[in-house]
Amino acid sequence: MKLKSLAVYSLLLLTAFIYSCKDSSQFTINGTIKNPGSLRLVYLIEADSTQIKVVDSTTLGENGKFQFKHVAPYANLYKLRIGSAGGGEQSAGANNVFDLIAKNGDDIEFSTDNNDNTHTYIIKGSDDSEKIKEFNKISNFYGEKNSKLVAEYQEKSQKLGKQSDSLLKVYMPTFQKNLADYGAAVLKFVNDNKTSLAGFYAATSLDVYKFEPQLVAYSDDIKANFKDNPGVQTFVRQMEKIKPVSIGHKAPDFTVTGIDGKPIKLADYKGKYVMLDFWASWCAPCRQENPNVVKQYAAFNSKGFNILGISLDKDKAAWQKAINDDKLTWAHGSDLNSFEGPTETLYHIEAIPSNFIIDPQGNIVAKNITGADLEAFLNKTFNKVQ
């Protein structure tokens, strides 16, 4: 028994010694490309959310093997891009790009078969790389679904010889459902992987307009993690800026100058539902949405729905003309200073159209909803049977 215990103890010591000899100042990737064909060059690309750049390159050996040793200032997303000789980095096709996450001390093994049309690859030695591979499966699955749907729609449109609104109405619900399903699947992956960088990179694929409350909450959960990763910290700072004007928070008060030169305060709408509608006369999407806003105002104003239009125009005459032309009969104000106005800065307006719906208690209850989504929200809020 003593000899057996000694042998086990010696094995543990040997294992500890081997691991202690690993180089923690850099990470290593040992790769194998089976059936490489014309593929000769491999590029290591740093690809976090702040930059994308080639940091190293090498040539495949005759046996399809390659190796990278690279110092990572922090755990980060990288891509392996495999291309043909003489074609440069751009010669690599989209299917010959593989994601991984690496940090110093990682000893990663990578392999793929160039003859495999599914572009399956195996990666060992990095749990985060396995997770980013899992996320890519989700992304590719829904991407392929919508690509097929778009191709089918385009084929039928070509047969008709024109784009058809009725045909679009047939395909659009499925397209939107696929996007919604994708968002739900990604959000689940993100919340299941809060301690992994893979979760963060998945989160950056979500539309902040549609998933703002979830992304703000996620940012709070991870801000103590990955402190040395600039991409993560930039995301955290962005969410902290948005948070005060995110859904569920009190809308910050402001005073804006009305079209008649008199001050308008958000506090004037205390106890009422009001939509802050940020727009401009020069904004084509805003002008396209205005007929819908006019329609909803006509339907719900008598039920308690108010609008305060806030223009990003600098030209008062153009602003006034757009109000008259589009028949916008609600109150209007502007700082006449585009995105640099104090109201726009307070509400972190970076694109228009943008809107905030505020309830009688002064809470932001919806943001950036347009078209049918705006009508559905108002129907639900004011208990109108659809």
Give the residues covered by each predicted segment:
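Bacterial Sec-dependent N-terminal signal peptides
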Residues: 1-32, 383-386
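A non-transmembrane, solvent-exposed segment enriched in polar/low-complexity residues
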Residues: 21-174
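N-terminal targeting signals for export/organelle localization
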Residues: 95-97, 107-108, 168, 176-247
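Thiol/disulfide oxidoreductase modules built on the thioredoxin-like
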Residues: 205, 328, 335-383
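N-terminal "domain-start" segment that seeds a small globular fold
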Residues: 234-266, 330, 376-384
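Conserved redox-active cysteine motifs that mediate thiol-disulfide chemistry
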Residues: 270-271, 278-295
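Structural microenvironment flanking redox-active thiols in thiol-disulfide oxidoreductases
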Residues: 287-326, 336-345
